[in-house]
Structure formats: structure tokens, C-alpha cells
Design a protein with these regions (language model features):
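C-terminal juxtamembrane segment of a hydrophobic transmembrane alpha-helix
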Residues: 28-48, 59
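Generic, low-specificity signal for short hydrophobic/alpha-helical stretches with a mild N-terminal bias
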Residues: 26, 36-39, 133, 175
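Broad hydrophobic/π-residue packing in well-ordered secondary structure
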Residues: 26-27, 39, 49, 153-156, ...
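N-terminal alpha-helical signal peptides/signal-anchor transmembrane segments
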Residues: 44, 57-73
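Glycine-centered recognition micro-motifs in short, flexible terminal segments and loops
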Residues: 7-32
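Short, conserved structural patches
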Residues: 1-9, 67-205
Length: 205
């Protein structure tokens, strides 16, 4: 009996107490991946909401441009019809205001930043942004003119842990607010819409 006790010593009470943490460690091992996956789902859902609102904003901006470009010059500081100067005209500001109103809920709660309204070529989806004075020919019996508008925003990734996984960090500092990306990652979201341009005139009382 003495030899058996020497070969198989009884565990001390302290050793039994040390083994009680095994269940907690196993819980952490199983819980953390599931919890991280849940956070990533929330972050992806928020980005999907931003995507939907951006698409809606692009459509509203295209519809506004189709009306504003051919509208009465008296309402836009005497600017010529069928013409729009990017970032330098009252007509462009009116189109941008329509986009900002559509994006207002996400702007007010800080989900999106740096809203940009660009006008690529009507025949080039995803094309580069055009600058300067743009001219648009009203549609006729042989040609359907179109206005293409793209809305570009930076979506803020707020969900902890998941924002580092879903939204990659950017180390390019080209803007004064780019340093915030180190603390709060951003994800670019873009959406385009195209709308026929009739060049219709409107009568006002």
C-alpha cells in the first residue's frame, strides 16, 4: 500500500481548486470567435445600410440634375441652360443639396463623411470624374441623352474589433481628417445612377 501511494499520490486540495478554471478557459475559447463573428455581422449590416442609402442618394441626385440643368436661368444666377460647372456653379450646388438631403440621416449621426458628387461620362459607368464646365444636349427623336451621377462617401466603421477586420486601415494622409482613420477606420462606398435628360423647361408663377 505504501508503494501504491507513492506511485499514485492523492491530489492536494490546492490542485483541485486550480482545475476549476478549465471550464472558464474553454468558454473563452468558444465564445470569442462567436462573439467576433457576431460583431462582424453587425458591421457588415451597417455598411449595407450605407450602401442602400448611397444608391438612393445617387438616384435622387441624377433626377435633380436632369431637372436643374435645363431649368430657368433666373433661378440659378443667370447661368446658361444645358450647362453645369462642377464645384463652381449654382446648378451644381442645387444637385449637391439634393444629395445631402437624401444622405442627411447618416450625415447627422456621423456614419458617413466626405460626400462627393461627381459626373462621369454618360456612356462610361464607373468612369473618371469630369471637371470644369459640362454641357448636356437635350434628348430628341433620334438620341436619348442621359445624366450620370456618382455619389462617393466614406463610411465610418464603429463596431469594435469588427472594424479592424471589415474595414482595412489606410496609412495615406492626403487630407487633414485622414489621421482619424487610425482611430476609426473608414470604408469607401460608391453608387451611380443614370437618368434621361429631356432638357424640359418649367413655368413658374
Amino acid at each position: 500500500m505504501i508503494e501504491n501511494d507513492a506511485l499514485h499520490p492523492m491530489p492536494s486540495p490546492g490542485t483541485l481548486r486550480d482545475q476549476r478554471g478549465v471550464v472558464f478557459v474553454e468558454f473563452l475559447i468558444a465564445f470569442l470567435p462567436v462573439y467576433t463573428f457576431f460583431l462582424c455581422l453587425i458591421q457588415l449590416a451597417l455598411l449595407f445600410v450605407v450602401r442602400l442609402v448611397t444608391e438612393h442618394t445617387a438616384m435622387n441626385a441624377a433626377r435633380a440634375a436632369a431637372v436643374v440643368i435645363g431649368d430657368d436661368p433666373k433661378r440659378y444666377g443667370g447661368e446658361r441652360i444645358n450647362r453645369l460647372t462642377v464645384r463652381g456653379s449654382v446648378r451644381y450646388d442645387a444637385v449637391r443639396d439634393a444629395a445631402l438631403l437624401s444622405m442627411a440621416p447618416l450625415i447627422l449621426n456621423g456614419f458617413v463623411h466626405d460626400v462627393k458628387i461627381v459626373f462621369p461620362s454618360e456612356e462610361r459607368p464607373g468612369g473618371p470624374a469630369r471637371t470644369g464646365a459640362l454641357t448636356f444636349a437635350p434628348m430628341n427623336d433620334s438620341r436619348v441623352s442621359k445624366v450620370r451621377v456618382r455619389v462617393e462617401v466614406e463610411a465610418e466603421c464603429r463596431i469594435g474589433i469588427a472594424n479592424r477586420i471589415v474595414c482595412p486601415l489606410s496609412f495615406g494622409f492626403t487630407h487633414a481628417t485622414d489621421a482619424l482613420r487610425m482611430a476609426v477606420p473608414m470604408h469607401p462606398v460608391r453608387a451611380e445612377a443614370v437618368y434621361p435628360y429631356q432638357g424640359a423647361r418649367y413655368d413658374y408663377p
